[in-house]
């Protein structure tokens, strides 16, 4: 079975529970994106495994979170305060629910606290929470309020169900007729946007075999990079080899 835990503001709990519960039911494509989208038949029908969604009343796997920015604080101070509140809730769940993906509801009212850039640092709430959880081996899924308002219900349920399945460390499919000695690597980067500071590029790669197994991550600072005409950073031969 696949277990979810939830962090959600009290006044949104009913709405968010109803949204997550849609994963258990059928949804038609309504002829939207017919080239690649098919009807969603329900989580257990697709993956042949139950999905356990906690109820928002009297369940330790569903934690409330209430945050309002304080007027006497700067926007970036409120942003950090919110991020630390969320990570404290993640730790609280992780201490009792070790085998679950933690779903975090991000309401529109938190929009002003989701990111900032000043002379000292740049901040992104999504990245902060993801980095914190990843460092502790905790799977998370952030869902913004606007996702609940999106009309592409079938597509969203496919995307979300696959995300929960994969984050439970299961493999949804493998490719046929792949070379056994083939390996795959994905590389990403992050460029600092802080003014008056040199650009910082972080190389993030994941490596896995031809069956999509043996996934490994590597995160490291890259010093000897060069920029193309579009200012996209590329690894030097030495960094790429390492």
Mark where each language-model region is.
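Long, low-complexity, intrinsically disordered terminal regions
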Residues: 1-242
């Amino acid at each position: 079975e696949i277990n979810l835990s939830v962090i959600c503001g009290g006044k949104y709990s009913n709405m968010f529970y109803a949204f997550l519960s849609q994963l258990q039911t059928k949804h038609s494509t309504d002829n939207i994106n017919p080239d690649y989208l098919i009807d969603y038949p329900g989580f257990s029908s697709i993956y042949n495994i139950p999905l356990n969604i906690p109820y928002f009343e009297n369940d330790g796997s569903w934690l409330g979170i209430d945050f309002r920015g304080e007027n006497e604080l700067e926007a970036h101070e409120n942003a950090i305060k919110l991020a630390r509140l969320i990570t404290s809730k993640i730790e609280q769940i992780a201490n009792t629910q070790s085998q679950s993906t933690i779903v975090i509801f991000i309401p529109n009212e938190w929009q002003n606290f989701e990111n900032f850039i000043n002379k000292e640092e740049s901040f992104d709430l999504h990245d902060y929470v993801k980095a914190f959880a990843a460092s502790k081996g905790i799977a998370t899924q952030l869902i913004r309020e606007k996702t609940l308002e999106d009309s592409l219900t079938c597509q969203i349920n496919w995307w979300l169900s696959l995300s929960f399945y994969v984050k439970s460390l299961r493999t949804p499919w493998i490719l046929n007729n792949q070379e056994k000695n083939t390996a795959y690597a994905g590389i990403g980067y992050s460029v600092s946007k802080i003014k008056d500071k040199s650009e910082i590029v972080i190389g993030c790669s994941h490596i896995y075999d031809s069956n999509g197994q043996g996934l490994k991550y590597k995160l490291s600072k890259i010093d000897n990079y060069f920029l193309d005409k579009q200012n996209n950073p590329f690894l030097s031969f030495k960094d790429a080899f390492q």
